[in-house]
């Protein structure tokens, strides 16, 4: 039995004594303890070494007191498992090769055997689960098909997604072929993560806001829905969070995927999101990550604002406090600790 199941209870919209908190990228460069591990190895080797991945996954639980751990990995492990070469240089960016721009390129990609190609993630999950010793839940995750598609077609990050959109608009069937292949891999990967011990799943659609509403409905949401339904069909009790960054105008469409919770960027008042969705799903978020550069007073007042905007809890509401995106690498860890402690204390009044 979990000693602290607040995170899972909030996702399932069950009564909680306070609002749980974790933050995206909580295992990362802002922590000196993470940097000490990272100095010894490169980023992808860290992801692929279960002992090290488990160590950095647990650091923020020990040091910051967050209510959930998220397995240390990267969304691009799927692209690599499908046959692409992935280079991640933390300060310089990301390079994938060969780029995928034709039917022949797509045909060369495999739908991998997850245990064979991504077994190291499952090993890290099992080890982390054991070392956490039921203190807090463990989150497994994947990138969404659209985001992984953009990396495959662009060969890295992009300002305007020209190659990805060219495929969408000129050869939509080919785009769907690639998206479908990626989505099939994501679904299998998520199921294996639950099998290995993940208590909840988050799907990250980091580049969601690059698409218009209609394009998002056509090229992104159907695949997210496939992934959510794959998890729900086999593991109905495992909560799934969808983080479609800054898709604030189509919240109800995202809720229609069948997810339990929705991650919000900081560009929307959480009160508006709650009013629109009427507690159909739990909400996660949504403090601007740069608030953590602020004074202690400012951090507290901005966090208090998010809690107040979400408002009083009912029997069917759920809120997980988080940032609207990942914590930035140059934030003072003391500021995150202050935020975590403040949210734990301040949120009780709304429950």
From Swiss-Prot:
Keyword terms of this UniProt record: Cytoplasm, Decarboxylase, Lyase, Porphyrin biosynthesis
InterPro entries associated with the record: UROD/MetE-like_sf, Uroporphyrinogen_deCO2ase_HemE, Uroporphyrinogen_deCOase
The EC number(s) this enzyme carries: 4.1.1.37
Entry's Gene Ontology molecular function annotations: uroporphyrinogen decarboxylase activity
Site (Transition state stabilizer): 74
Gene3D superfamilies: 3.20.20.210
Domain of life: Bacteria
Leader sequence segment: none
Reactions catalysed according to its record: uroporphyrinogen III + 4 H(+) = coproporphyrinogen III + 4 CO2
Family, similarity comment: Belongs to the uroporphyrinogen decarboxylase family.
NCBIfam families assigned: hemE (TIGR01464)
Record's function text: Catalyzes the decarboxylation of four acetate groups of uroporphyrinogen-III to yield coproporphyrinogen-III.
HAMAP family: URO_D
Annotated protein name in UniProt: Uroporphyrinogen decarboxylase
Gene for this chain: hemE
